[in-house]
């Protein structure tokens, strides 16, 4: 299979370029390389032609990928073994250098003073002459570790050549002896290759065995949050102890080779190949078997499955659709459910998602309830609008409760104990202003206790949501308490709120302002937090 491609190649700058031939000179010639790192040269179009293996099906392509993965596993094991050996040597050198610094070089007692004036005894390893040569040997070991890091980077780059890793402008080095370990017939340079498939690095690290092939139903698009957190935690611990210069972890490079190597150096003892994932310091989470859904934790149904049911039901060629005027147990709606189940199973044959029949049927019934609600709202538009408004206010109360709870940890223990029994029903109703579009009018519930009301005002004064310019306070809401709210303690629920309103009449209570116009605050204790500006038209 012949191919021809034109690639826009942007050579890296002097600060980013780093290959095996200059890895050892990067520390000594740091000043020279730094002076050359100016503006990067413009992109140069490169035309590449060649021939390669003709793949007839996806199975053959996966077979080629699996062969390359097996080869990459072997290279990774070799690099890991060399890294462990260098780690043991590095630790022994550090111990000996520490003894030399402290003047605690072990001298046999029988020779005593005769050995004090003679040359020091020969020791195994690089420390034979003086501490100066020991430091030179230590730097040589560090350079050798850098070369091992380049070897590991070759493994990652080989996966990128296959399209198994995402492209990223990371500093990758390639030894001269390993430059020809790419795909046969491929003449692209390392920085010129473009990915073909989705990344497999996260799942590749998660494999247990040495030659266990990667059978992934769904390709991960990026490193899992647990993996990124583990890399961030592991990298600062390795730098001060080993004395090596560690590059910062870059999640967009899909497993930085240098960070992985330095994390592997933490494991000094020999281990089997099954310990690769543990020695790399990665906490790999499995692929999300439900796709990119579950954005909202409160969502009961899977988002991917719900969208699939919606698309199948509303397809232009589909005549079997739910009848909202009938029950779910009607013969027509039952036939629609059976039809949707058959279509969903056909759609999910090649899908990596493994849904049970119960989940499929539940998604169909949930969509029927949606169509049923739409039908009822069409019969009574005012009732539908009212339910929609109530749902919007309830959603805003949940969000307000979450915002206030997130900053409650900054308050005292007494306020935290009071907040433990608070529910979303005690939050204010953030209604849309009828006079000013885009303005929310926060109307506190009438049955909320005064102490909790003051605490809510202080929470709003210290939160980003509460101090928004488009959020103002209004009169108490007309919402009545539920049966659950009436069981709350008196510190949260005021059982005499109706009597107090009747006694107050038209006069405002002391300390509470009038609600003729929406205003920013109605608590006098907030004068130190919020600037009050009231404008009245005569």
UniProtKB/Swiss-Prot annotation:
The modification Phosphoserine is found at residues 224, 285, 428. It comes from Homo sapiens. GO terms for biological process: cell differentiation; positive regulation of gene expression. There is a cross-link at residues 128, 221 (Glycyl lysine isopeptide (Lys-Gly) (interchain with G-Cter in SUMO2)). Pfam families: DUF4616 (PF15394). Keywords: Isopeptide bond, Phosphoprotein, Secreted, Signal, Ubl conjugation. This is Uncharacterized protein C14orf93. It comes from the Eukaryota. GO terms for molecular function: RNA binding. Residues 101-131, 233-253, 488-523 are annotated as: Disordered. It is found in: Secreted. GO terms for cellular component: extracellular region. Residues 1-17 form the signal peptide. The gene is C14orf93. Its main location: secreted.
């Amino acid at each position: 299979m012949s191919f021809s491609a034109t690639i826009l190649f942007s050579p890296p700058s002097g600060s980013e370029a780093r290959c095996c031939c200059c890895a050892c000179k990067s520390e000594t010639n740091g000043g020279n390389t730094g002076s050359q790192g100016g503006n990067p040269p413009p992109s140069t179009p490169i035309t590449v032609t060649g021939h390669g293996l003709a793949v007839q099906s996806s199975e053959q392509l996966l077979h080629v990928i699996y062969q390359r993965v097996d080869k990459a596993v072997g290279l990774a094991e070799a690099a890991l073994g060399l890294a462990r050996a260098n780690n043991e040597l590095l630790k022994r050198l550090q111990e000996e250098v520490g003894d030399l610094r402290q003047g605690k070089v072990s001298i046999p007692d029988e020779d005593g003073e005769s050995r004090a004036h003679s040359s020091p005894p020969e020791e195994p390893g690089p420390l034979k002459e003086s501490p100066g040569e020991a430091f030179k040997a230590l730097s040589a070991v560090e350079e050798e570790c850098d070369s091992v890091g380049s070897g590991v980077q070759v493994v990652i780059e080989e996966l990128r050549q296959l399209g198994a890793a995402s492209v990223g402008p990371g500093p990758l080095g390639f030894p001269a002896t390993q430059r020809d370990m790419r795909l046969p017939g491929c003449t692209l340079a390392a920085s010129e290759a473009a990915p073909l498939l989705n990344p497999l690095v996260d799942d590749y690290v998660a494999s247990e065995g040495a030659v266990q092939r990667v059978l992934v139903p769904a390709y991960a698009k990026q490193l899992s949050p647990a993996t990124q957190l583990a890399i961030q935690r592991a990298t600062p611990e390795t730098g001060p102890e080993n004395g090596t210069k560690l590059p910062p972890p870059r999640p967009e490079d899909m497993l930085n080779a240098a960070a992985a190597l330095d994390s592997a150096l933490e494991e000094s003892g020999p281990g089997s190949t099954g310990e690769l994932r543990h020695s790399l310091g990665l906490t790999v989470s499995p692929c999300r078997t439900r796709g990119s859904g579950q954005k909202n934790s409160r969502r009961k149904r899977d988002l991917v499955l719900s969208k699939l049911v919606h698309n199948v039901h509303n397809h232009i060629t589909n005549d079997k659709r739910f009848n909202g005027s009938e029950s779910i147990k009607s013969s027509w709606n039952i036939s629609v459910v059976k039809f949707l189940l058959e279509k969903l199973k056909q759609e999910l044959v090649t899908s990596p998602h493994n849904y049970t029949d119960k989940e499929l049927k539940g998604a169909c019934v949930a969509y029927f309830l949606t169509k049923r609600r739409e039908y009822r709202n069409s019969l009574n538009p005012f009732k539908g609008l009212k339910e929609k408004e109530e749902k919007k206010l309830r959603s805003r109360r949940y969000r307000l409760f979450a915002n206030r709870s997130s900053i409650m940890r900054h308050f005292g223990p007494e306020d935290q104990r009071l907040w433990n029994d608070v529910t979303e029903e005690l939050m204010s109703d953030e209604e849309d202003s009828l006079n000013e579009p885009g303005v929310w009018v926060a109307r506190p519930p009438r049955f909320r206790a005064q102490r909790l009301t003051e605490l809510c005002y202080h929470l709003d004064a210290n939160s980003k949501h509460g101090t928004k310019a488009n959020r103002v306070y209004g009169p108490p809401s007309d919402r009545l308490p539920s049966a659950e709210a009436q069981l709350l303690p008196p510190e949260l629920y005021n059982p005499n709120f109706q009597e107090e309103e009747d006694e107050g009449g038209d006069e405002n209570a002391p300390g509470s302002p009038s609600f003729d116009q929406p205003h920013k605050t109605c608590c006098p204790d907030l004068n130190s937090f919020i600037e009050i500006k009231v404008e009245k038209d005569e």
